[in-house]
Amino acid sequence: MKPMHIAMALFSAAMFFVLAGVFMGVQLELDGTKLVVDTAADIRWQWIFIGTAVVFFFQLLRPMFQKAVKHVSGPKFILPAIDGSTVKQKLFLMALLVIAVAWPFMVSRGSVDIATMTMIYIILGLGLNVVVGLSGLLVLGYGGFYAIGAYTFALLNHYYGLGFWTCLPLAGLVSAAAGFLLGFPVLRLRGDYLAIVTLGFGEIVRILLLNNTEITGGPNGISQIPKPTLFGLEFSRSTREGGWDTFSNFFGVKYDPSDRVIFLYLVALLLVVLSLFVINRLLRMPLGRAWEALREDEIACRSLGLSPTRIKLTAFTISAAFAGFAGTLFAARQGFVSPESFTFAESAFVLAIVVLGGMGSQFAVILAAVLLVVSRELMRDFNEYSMLMLGGLMVLMMIWRPQGLLPMTRPQLKLKSGQAKGEQA
């Protein structure tokens, strides 16, 4: 163990202790008309000391840890692309689909509701993966398109009485139009500049929704958003005003509140399957190759006769459309939307799904969405530290496996040893 490693471990632990002591170790209390700084509860200091010890030993043992896991991040840990191109992959995908359809009938109502939220984040992750993972454009304000889709459904239902299935394509079109309009001012921007512009866009959308109280309801939001129906049959005890009939009354079965949750899950699953189908078809088209060319080298992309302007516009437009679909599903699940549901934390969470899973890989996005959403639901007691945990997880991933859990594999051709020697000769 080198003295430099010990010194770095002590320095990192000291920095963590100071920062955690400031943010977690003190609290403000109201004493009459003034605020008084007081020490926090003992349980917080216990966690601070535990975190300090973890940081110290992690920094101390990191060189040995990196050597030990070097073989884990090798090629054998990279799974092949799962796109249904082979018979085995088709059978595997069919088995997953059957399990996903049968699963809500075997678990509790709460588990199905969490799975529905997971499906929403899968759609968001797949959409953001188009512009970040495939096109190489860093977007930090994806929550703005998400909010546009949700509020499109809420406003059309509130003012015009339109249902879920009518608003679903309209919300996608409105969000796609917003992505198309945003694409024009960012055509010449790259990297950090593009990220700042998109971050500003997401905040502008949220603030407009927050301040426009006459139309959007401001901070109070919009409530009483209906759930999707099955050919006009509502999954409720009684029909809404102007409704046709209920599912239980039409089929003569006993009313079960779980039917509404299960049907919403199946709708979300259908949208996920359609999203995967559309994206995989696009990747096999020249447009998908153009996205990858733009990500690898924009100058080379121009030299091949491709227009980066059109490629960026299509990426922004298609990505925003998926966010609109997810926003509609989110509004239907919640039955209520407000600007506080679309903060920067949502955009960061979706970006973490894409980065941690592996940029460019659809299967990796699904895996990361399941892991992160389920983990967040299980750690509801630590909700105030969710962004801290998410940031720490991303730091660890960038150190251990910067390419993501399951990075996208690219087609490769390898010459046999005999052919290689013949070419060298």
Curated annotation (Swiss-Prot):
CDD domains: TM_PBP1_LivM_like. It is found in: Cell inner membrane. The keyword Transmembrane applies. InterPro entries: ABC_transp_permease (IPR001851), LivHM_N (IPR021807), LivM-like (IPR043428). The keyword Coiled coil does not apply. Belongs to the binding-protein-dependent transport system permease family. LivHM subfamily. This is High-affinity branched-chain amino acid transport system permease protein LivM. It comes from Salmonella typhimurium (strain LT2 / SGSC1412 / ATCC 700720). The gene is livM.
